[in-house]
Amino acid sequence: MSLKIGIDVGSTTVKVVVLDEQDNLLFRSYERHLSMVREKTCELLRRAEPILKGQRVKAVITGSAGLGLAKSAKVDFVQEVFATAEAVERFIPDTDAVIELGGEDAKIIFFQGSLEERMNGSCAGGTGAFIDQMATLVGVTADELDELSLGYEKIYPIASRCGVFAKSDIQPILNQGARKEDVAASIFQAVVDQTVAGLAQGRDITGKVVFLGGPLHFLKGLRQRFQETLQLDNDHAIFPENGDCFAAIGAALCSQGYGEYEYEDVYQRLVDSVEDRGGTQTMPPLFASQEEYDEFLTRHNSKKPPEVDADTYTGKAYLGIDAGSTTTKLCLIAPDGGLLYTYYSSNRGNPVSVILEQLHAIYDKFGDRITIAGSAVTGYGEDLIKSAFQVDAGLVETVAHFRAASHFSPGVDFIIDIGGQDMKCFKIRNNAVDSIMLNEACSSGCGSFIETFAKALGYSIADFSKMGLLAKHPVNLGSRCTVFMNSSVKQAQKDGATVEDISAGLSISIVKNAVYKVIRAASADDLGQNIVVQGGTFLNDAVLRAFELELGRNVTRPVIAGLMGAFGAALTARDLGLEQSNILTAEQLKDFTHKSNPTTCKGCTNHCSLTINLFDGGRRFISGNRCSKPLGGKKTEMPDMFHYKYKKLRAMEGKGSGDGSRGRMGIPFGLNMYENLPFWYTLFTKLNFEVVLSPESSRGIYLKGQHTIPSDTVCYPAKLLHGHVEALVEAGVDAIWYPCMSYNNDEGIGDNHYNCPVVAYYPELLAANVPALKKTKFLDPYVGLWRHKDCAKRLSELFYTEFGIPKKETKAAVEAAYDAYNAYVEDIHKTGEQYIEEARAQGKPIIVMAGRPYHIDPEINHGINDLITSFGFVLITEDTLAYREGYETRTVLNQWTFQSRMYNAARYVCTQKDMQMVQLVSFGCGTDAITTDELRSILESGGKLYTQLKIDDITNLGAVKIRIRSLMAAMDARKEAK
């Protein structure tokens, strides 16, 4: 008789099971391995020794981190999908699909027909590690997050494809006072959405669904979100008793056909494998000796504020608060800038309570000895904190940091600030912030990146950072995304790298990311001669040293590098010149109360998720809004081309000049329909069709089509199309018109006039992936509007075949459609001209929003246009200016119409004093990878500022607000310099 051992080595846990010959479970164990994979496996086997000692056994290893161990120990290996399928078919034979979430992997296995599996690729969004990261962010354990989620009232949209993006969604929501219960449930919902959209890739998850893996085994809230989203009752949602160990059980079952050994022999082979390591690339050490490190410390410790004795000081004091995305910082200074009190800590998901606690501490410590004569706040939570505590002034982060940097280094020309999850770089010209770079899509070069690794390896961030300073062989981990880096670290550990080497390697990676991915520097001279580094991440000496080595020059790091935002705010508070601050006194703080309620604004189609913060004395602060409507203020109607174009296009439905006798023609309102709708609307109404547009885009429209999206990497505007066509089918239209169009009209401004591949051919993808389209006539022919004669011929033949329409009638309708399109373009040019004249008559600055025609969709731009006009800008679009400049050769292949327009508009902006350009970029846009650098180059060489706003299904505009205000601050500074 032999026993069967199944070992599942996952990315974060090891599972060991022992089965008898009848497949009864004799032993099971599930534990985190903290990257000590081989040691933990041996430890768990030792625990099973009472059962295994002296027995003949068959052993099989499975799991994402198991192959290396199996090879070293010469134990049989089975791929985890087969192991899981084996266990499911043995114990739950009528299963239709399995959803399994692990530490860093997620998979769906479909059992209908042949076995088909889908696994996550390079991204660990939506897995156990993602949930752990999010729990840390909220300041609770994963179990507490689960407990919280069960008491939710409202779900916020959160991106889960990437821990970084989720952080940038969650942090502002927390900072604006949202309930942790709602945030917890929203995190789980994000995991569900990621699994359904990212993994199912358009295939329906129906029938009997088995849920496996640790997260689904332990987290009730996650299970609830899956059941609700997939609409599964208790008979169809199966959560097996040993769901966390199913792959290990499957591995044990698979051992049937493998060799039999003495248990002691198998165990010894596993023990021996602990010492078996491979080879990892290494780099030179950060410091060659302790002396070199001491000299480095002496140099950097010289930059500090004046000394002041806080215990005896009496007089005026100035308070600066930096309510950052993950941390809260305070500085109380004397008039000469000497530090009286500082605070730097995580905001624990509730910045209001942290600052309340700190104000009490300040009043307790200083009592009547000081008078707070001024206060200022900066950072993500600026508006909330200003409102909560009646702070005197608020200022944008970029200005606060520059203010502090120039205090320590008056001639500073470049500032780099690396915080928890954001990285800001400012070029200083003429004593003002001139251009700003922020990390767009990824925080792999930021502080929370190292912190996450430190915690995963069981160290505090302080200890972990110190370990790398004198490491002899820093590991070369590349400069990639957090998730990829995870696998690099794991590989390095398997190859025997020490924690010291990994710590040093991570510091070097952070710097490479900052210099080459965010700043995109070709050389150190691109940055500047007088560089100041700040932000908590630079308090890490290893990161600072790596930065100096990478640039080949010394930089300035003030001793208070982590407090620079708060210090800059305190200096600003001092410069207000007040006698007494308005900030709540110790007496007023006794009555301080704060309650927050989530709600949805019904003021317009944006349906902003609002958080109403209520304070004592009837004060309230509303966050999440993109205009002043919910605040009771009247919306200032600044000229706005986004609104104008959108309203004009949405009106293009109905029977028009025809009678609608040929039926209802559905047109999905998305992508290039924002460019060509005037043509199609006129064509179909002239042919007596009634034009039915799909409803306005919304989160609901996205969710309606989410299950048919085959790739999670496509841009959000394309994803929305799935919901638009589903809605048209539901509306019962007679046909849906959505042609494939390789080309746009030739405007003579580029080397060619293509649509991007997604815009051009998305109709074919919809036809292949949206089953509902089989219920209607879906017309997606190839059409080229730019060749008038060919187009008329093509359409007249097509409509004769499909609808029996005489060719002559179609040709006449095509002529009318061209006239209508040309009239629309002419109207856009004229209106743009009119808006520019209005702006100049009123002395208002003009922002040119450069993007795609479909970026005017409020669901895609999330009301960014409202936000911009609320700051007093007149907003026009790139197509109102592009025709004013002729063709010019570019350094890149200029073959996409919409990009050509942006280049031309940027050239025109460079000739106008009162214009600045802001580029909208959809996350996942391939062609914009080229456009952004080219646009930056045109604008900066023309003396303009370059501002880019990345948009996606993420709706929180906190980061956008910072950018726009930074742009305004830079514009003001340039004016003053002149």
Locate each region found by the language model:
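Adenine-nucleotide phosphate-binding core of ATP-dependent small-molecule kinases
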Residues: A166-A197, S487-Y516
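Short glycine-rich, Thr/Ser-proximal phosphate-binding strand/loop in the N-terminal lobe
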Residues: K4-R46, E116-E117, G121, I321-A361, ...
